[in-house]
Amino acid sequence: MTEIKLNYHKTHFLTSAPDIRHLPEDSGVEIAFAGRSNAGKSTALNALTNQKNLARTSKTPGRTQLINLFEVEPNCKLVDLPGYGYAAVPEQVKLQWQRSLGEYLQKRECLRGVVILMDIRHPLKDLDQQMIEWAVSAELPVLLLLTKADKLSQSARSKTVKMVREAILPFQGDVQVEAYSALNRIGIDKLATKLDSWFAEIFTQTQEG
């Protein structure tokens, strides 16, 4: 596998889609970012790309109802999936999102990895576990990012990471767990390295072709 190092600071907004049927052509490599509505998904993407407003952060959880696509380089896309599990969203909308997320993870051919973000103080809620299950059953590698890591002391942080690593063992898939803080820039390099390894396939194909 070719080793690559992409410049995530060059990432730019590509397009938005209301659901999987309106996504662009299923080609290249996509990596999805998923998480509960208040997990800090937009903040994490902005920290990775060093762009304050790339992914719009909202004080109202559940605001991101569209699938937003960002291009790192041609054929390398980051996909910001709608946040899930926010109480104020009508039940019907919630179920529709969940169906859409499940459909995307199971059917999108160019999807090569899933980053699932969880608040380090409230990890592994039911819907988080559902997402891990879907990803693992689709044979997709998963990076679990425990966000807002700056809210805990270093020892509490290590303890939570260890606890989550043990708790996910029954899923039996390729699941990695890391602490992440956009504020203190904890885990940003690890996220970039993992994304590089997932995107590397496209460059290997290019060289072989």
Curated annotation (Swiss-Prot):
GO terms for biological process: division septum assembly. InterPro entries: G_ENGB_dom, GTP-bd, GTP-bd_ribosome_bio_YsxC, P-loop_NTPase. The keyword NAD does not apply. The keyword Magnesium applies. Its cofactor is Mg(2+). GO terms for cellular component: cytosol. Coiled coil: none annotated. CDD domains: YihA_EngB. GO terms for molecular function: GTP binding; metal ion binding. It comes from the Bacteria. Residues 27-201 form the EngB-type G domain. Keywords: Cell cycle, Cell division, GTP-binding, Magnesium, Metal-binding, Nucleotide-binding, Septation. Mg(2+) binds at S42, T64. GTP binds at residues 35-42, 62-66, 80-83, 147-150, 180-182. Pfam families: MMR_HSR1. Necessary for normal cell division and for the maintenance of normal septation. Belongs to the TRAFAC class TrmE-Era-EngA-EngB-Septin-like GTPase superfamily. EngB GTPase family. This is Probable GTP-binding protein EngB.
